[in-house]
């Protein structure tokens, strides 16, 4: 918005020439981060007071960690603060004509809405389970598939008109269409190794990445500050990848696919980092507010969508290794329990408790130890992911 305003003012008078600074992507990214940070810090106390007055407190499962019972009643749905900060800051500083940022915003707010309904049911109905898994998965699938269907053609073409033409061509060809190499699965650490996916393969993979990342972040969000800092780190790293793929010169030099317009996602990633830091101010142990599903589902989906756009799905799995392991720990725990119950008549557990962070708590780690150690691991994984920029 401010970019368009600055361009309009420059056209009116040469005296506004100093506003050309807003044309620089890096400048707008810095301003987006600062804007989101300030909005979050200023709005945070008011939101916490409002949630407290409305008695929107987090119910704690009776079969959960005993040490977490004291957290019962802590205001939840604080993820709304993150989404507000991201949305306002991004709308102020990004190029409004950029379709990639719009699709990420829509996916983020869509998954945020699902999370809001889930949190609201937990609070109003006093039901720790909230929205039933089937219903939640259905709406996640609807948004994920719509985003995937748009992105498969959006990444292949440079304008919405061309996207529509490619879609029509795909339908007329009997749903058989070869996509350009940049729409393939990019393998890190190798020079220009890209496996063709086809339209169906791209849609399925994108759907799995978006929905999977959303649920993985949600499962990780179980301790004070545990999820938000890895989200900040991974999001910031993806912003660097977005800057590279959006710049023809850097993309060619580093042997990355050039995705025109993807660089503008740096503004969104910066806003996410600023909003995340503001939220961490209030979410640090002992937390004054919890993110809730409204934040966790939305942030995870946004990371997945950005990774798809910049063609770094595998790198996302590397940098977000904590999210992956947390999700796998739950799936393995549930699968093993059901298998052993069916075979031996009594369910057995692989871990003391799932997700993995609760296993370490049961093993004697303090909550802050688990959180900070997971942060350190994520930082190292992000550095490994960023090394793929050059190690090819």
Curated annotation (Swiss-Prot):
Its cofactor is Mg(2+). Its main location: membrane. GO terms for biological process: cell division; cell wall organization; peptidoglycan biosynthetic process; regulation of cell shape. GO terms for cellular component: plasma membrane. It is found in: Cell inner membrane. Catalyzes the initial step of the lipid cycle reactions in the biosynthesis of the cell wall peptidoglycan: transfers peptidoglycan precursor phospho-MurNAc-pentapeptide from UDP-MurNAc-pentapeptide onto the lipid carrier undecaprenyl phosphate, yielding undecaprenyl-pyrophosphoryl-MurNAc-pentapeptide, known as lipid I. Keywords: Cell cycle, Cell division, Cell inner membrane, Cell membrane, Cell shape, Cell wall biogenesis/degradation, Magnesium, Membrane, Metal-binding, Peptidoglycan synthesis, Transferase, Transmembrane, Transmembrane helix. Belongs to the glycosyltransferase 4 family. MraY subfamily. It is a multi-pass membrane protein. It comes from Delftia acidovorans (strain DSM 14801 / SPH-1). HAMAP family: MraY. Pathway: Cell wall biogenesis; peptidoglycan biosynthesis. Its EC number is 2.7.8.13. One of its GO terms (molecular function) is metal ion binding. Pfam families: Glycos_transf_4, MraY_sig1. The chain crosses the membrane at residues 24-44, 76-96, 100-120, 137-157, 170-190, 193-213, 225-245, 262-282, 289-309, 314-334, 369-389. This is Phospho-N-acetylmuramoyl-pentapeptide-transferase. It catalyses: UDP-N-acetyl-alpha-D-muramoyl-L-alanyl-gamma-D-glutamyl-meso-2,6-diaminopimeloyl-D-alanyl-D-alanine + di-trans,octa-cis-undecaprenyl phosphate = di-trans,octa-cis-undecaprenyl diphospho-N-acetyl-alpha-D-muramoyl-L-alanyl-D-glutamyl-meso-2,6-diaminopimeloyl-D-alanyl-D-alanine + UMP. It is an enzyme of class 2 (transferase). The gene is mraY.
